[in-house]
């Protein structure tokens, strides 16, 4: 499968910021892990990170025009209020899994609501970098069920 992995604001700072919540692995190490695991499973993985909402939307639309089979998105804080990203996910009709490194449901109240998850086929949270691999497996299972 051709899978796009999109990471939103501040995820480039993982390994630097709030290590007790997000872990000590660098963003670069997590990206390498995702690529390696995807390759082992026979997938073509494209990674993208931006701190800008419009760039994330552009990348989602690019996934449509470049015929991606699945998307994994960690919208970061946009999770809680970006109806524009929600609409972009809905508009492209590509199976998408939302991922969060931490368990957002065990944190502050404002983090418990996701406006982007309803546009996705599911959500993985609280599994650290393994959440991305679980999302790959979810996309595989979804494809097999079609």
Swiss-Prot record:
Pfam families: DHquinase_II (PF01220). Substrate binds at residues 74, 80, 87, 101-102, 111. Keywords: Amino-acid biosynthesis, Aromatic amino acid biosynthesis, Lyase. It is an enzyme of class 4 (lyase). Homododecamer. Belongs to the type-II 3-dehydroquinase family. This is 3-dehydroquinate dehydratase. The gene is aroQ.
């Amino acid at each position: 499968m051709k899978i796009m992995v999109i990471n939103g604001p501040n995820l480039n700072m993982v390994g630097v910021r709030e290590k007790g919540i997000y872990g000590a692995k660098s963003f670069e190490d997590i990206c390498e892990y995702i690529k390696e695991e995807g390759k082992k499973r026979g997938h073509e993985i494209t990674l993208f990170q931006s701190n800008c909402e419009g760039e994330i939307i552009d990348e989602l639309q690019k996934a449509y025009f470049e015929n991606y089979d699945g998307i994994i998105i960690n919208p970061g804080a946009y999770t809680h209020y970006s109806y524009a990203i929600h609409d972009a996910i809905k508009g492209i009709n590509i199976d998408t899994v939302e991922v969060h490194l931490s368990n957002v449901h065990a944190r502050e109240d404002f983090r418990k609501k996701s406006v982007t998850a309803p546009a996705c086929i599911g959500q993985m949270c609280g599994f650290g970098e393994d959440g991305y691999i679980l999302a790959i497996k979810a996309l595989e299972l979804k494809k097999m069920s079609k």
